[in-house]
């Protein structure tokens, strides 16, 4: 049989998730900004590397590839951070929904 303590624990977790969800849009936006900045740096570095190289088009492209590899990694890391932030937000929403259902069931059980 459900008791008040279980309901209190569920309510506390719901409050925490609501607080986390309130911060989620800022976290996602910050991650989006990180992707934009990383892509901008990569684009500028590619242009600069191409201009400072010489030779055939293939040689220039190879030069660019070598010189901006780290920045490409930075873009991928930024994209992964954005995806993580989105997934975390969805996970919190799902957990909140489950806890709200559980709270309703506990309340009903307590009334019986």
What are these regions (language model features)?
Residues 28, 32-35, 39, 75-106:
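Long amphipathic alpha-helical coiled-coil segments
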Residues 28-60:
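Extended alpha-helical coiled-coil "stalk/arm" regions
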Residues 1-24:
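Short, charge-rich amphipathic alpha-helices with coiled-coil/heptad character
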Residues 47, 64-66, 94, 101:
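A periodicity- and composition-biased signal for non-globular, repetitive helical segments
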Residues 54-81:
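Short, glycine/alanine-rich amphipathic alpha-helical segment
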Residues 1-2, 108-112:
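Short acidic DE-rich linear segments
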């Amino acid at each position: 049989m459900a008791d008040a303590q279980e309901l209190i624990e569920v309510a506390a977790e719901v409050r925490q998730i609501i607080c986390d969800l309130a911060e989620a849009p800022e976290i996602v936006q910050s991650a989006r900004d990180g992707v934009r900045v990383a892509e901008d740096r990569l684009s500028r570095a590619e242009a600069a590397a191409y201009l400072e190289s010489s030779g055939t088009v293939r040689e220039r492209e190879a030069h660019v590839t070598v010189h901006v590899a780290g920045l490409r990694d930075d873009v991928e890391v930024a994209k992964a951070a954005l995806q993580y932030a989105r997934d975390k937000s969805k996970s919190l929403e799902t957990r909140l929904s489950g806890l709200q259902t559980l709270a309703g069931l506990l309340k009903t059980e307590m009334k019986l």
